[in-house]
Amino acid sequence: MTQDNKLQVEAIRRGTVIDHIPAQVGMKLLSLFKLTATDERITIGLNLPSNQQGKKDLIKLENIFLTEEQANQLAIYAPHATVNRIDNYDVVRKQTLSLPERIDGVLTCPNSNCISRSEPVASGFRVQVHGQQVHLQCKYCEKEFEHQAVVQSA
């Protein structure tokens, strides 16, 4: 008797697969980007084995397709993730992520005096890269923060 040690996550016929998400980040992406606001089937793999990362998370969204803009907003949390478009069980498009110019309606400004924290307005940040550092500038208070300060407050 042979034993198959491969972990199997069911394939989807059509939709989006977000792969190579850092371990422990998949649930945060589902929540922040409201990926569960659907009646379609969602398959989540957490702490899956990965040759590149050691462990990774994976999200499969059946019959849901992300725009390039939506996909690139994921890069702030998962810069090395790939977003695969699936049709008839085949990958028809593979997108590597790049940081967008703006991230709107997802993150919270860490400045406790910012109007976005007390008023019903969608948050917005301009993404700036300074060498290897990513900074986010709030569109309301115009303060600039290291990206980690903003993503940890979300």
UniProtKB/Swiss-Prot annotation:
Molecular function GO labels: metal ion binding
GO cellular component, one term: aspartate carbamoyltransferase complex
Free-text comment on the cofactor: Binds 1 zinc ion per subunit.
Essential cofactor(s): Zn(2+)
UniProt keyword list: Metal-binding, Pyrimidine biosynthesis, Zinc
Record carries keyword S-adenosyl-L-methionine: no
UniProt cross-references to InterPro entries, sorted A to Z: Asp_carbamoyltransf_reg_N, Asp_carbamoylTrfase_reg, Asp_carbamoyltrfase_reg_C, Asp_carbatrfase_reg_C_sf, Asp_carbatrfase_reg_N_sf
Short name of any one Pfam family annotated for the protein: PyrI
Binding site for Zn(2+): 109, 114, 138, 141
Entry-linked SUPFAM superfamilies: Aspartate carbamoyltransferase, Regulatory-chain, C-terminal domain, Aspartate carbamoyltransferase, Regulatory-chain, N-terminal domain
Gene Ontology BP annotations: 'de novo' pyrimidine nucleobase biosynthetic process; pyrimidine nucleotide biosynthetic process
Family affiliation: Belongs to the PyrI family.
Assembly and oligomerization: Contains catalytic and regulatory chains.
Function summary: Involved in allosteric regulation of aspartate carbamoyltransferase.
Name the UniProt record assigns to this protein: Aspartate carbamoyltransferase regulatory chain
Organism whose genome encodes this protein: Sodalis glossinidius (strain morsitans)
